[in-house]
């Protein structure tokens, strides 16, 4: 049996691909594994990130962009079919992320592209305009195994990074960066005819060359669940609101708006995706419905639909304030996504 394993996904579903990755990682033996894949339009966040802070969730919902939480750390990234994704897995002591980084750099060299590793998890290219990032990575280790996964920007729609990601201004300032868009680059700028299949072939060849052996590719089809232990359960988890949103760290959120009938300040404390405390302050001449709303919100999931349902119930209880509460409902629907 080969010491290597190569898997290639034909699915563009981020939840499907991340479930495949997780199941392979759980069941892996002593083989060195390479998994190649890509996602349709998705924002992928790190295991411990807060999507409401990191992403423009309202814009994502409007545009049909999925949110996917991965099992590794690191920051939020936007994927489309202009990205190629790779995952290297190995048992310890054979796991070494510098080896997998070297394989990616060698693959790029085969394509005529000279890149270097920078910082903890980036691959960059030196240009006349400065250093440009073309790849980002994240890592995960357990006691006996580890994986390194990342993306390569081929011809991604870089303008959409700003549409869906909320970059931390302190992080940008600390790195001396003016914007996310200005520091990233597509590989197509350096090799105009580059394609996902070219990149996959180059990474595969560099993988085989490094270890001095080959393995037949296993194609993962989106039409049939792969023969992986507990895949259906893992796919259901990766697809769930509870995993992608509800696993966010505890946080607080303040919303405020001025309506014709009065100003409203709403304070939320959210844990595990559910509202655990709500306070509403208003100068409305009829505050009773809003005081009741604060009570009703406790225990609701932090989703616009759940808050809208509370408002619907409130309108039934306070029909004389239906116009004001309908306006409040619409505002909450637009503000919380």
From Swiss-Prot:
Write down the InterPro entries for this protein, in alphabetical order: aa-tRNA-synth_II/BPL/LPL (IPR045864), BPL_LPL_catalytic (IPR004143), Lipoate_ligase_A (IPR023741), Lipoate_protein_ligase_C (IPR019491), LipoylTrfase_LipoateP_Ligase (IPR004562)
Q: What pathway is this protein said to act in by its record?
A: Protein modification; protein lipoylation via exogenous pathway; protein N(6)-(lipoyl)lysine from lipoate: step 1/2; Protein modification; protein lipoylation via exogenous pathway; protein N(6)-(lipoyl)lysine from lipoate: step 2/2
Tell me the ranges covered by the BPL/LPL catalytic domain, including all copies: 28-215
Task: Check the record and name the Pfam families matching this protein.
Answer: Lip_prot_lig_C (PF10437), LplA-B_cat (PF21948)
Q: Which GO terms describe its cellular component?
A: cytosol
Per the similarity annotation, which family is this? Belongs to the LplA family.
Q: What is this protein called?
A: Lipoate-protein ligase A
Q: Which organism is it from?
A: Serratia proteamaculans (strain 568)
- Lineage from the top down? Bacteria, Pseudomonadati, Pseudomonadota, Gammaproteobacteria, Enterobacterales
> Gene symbol?
lplA
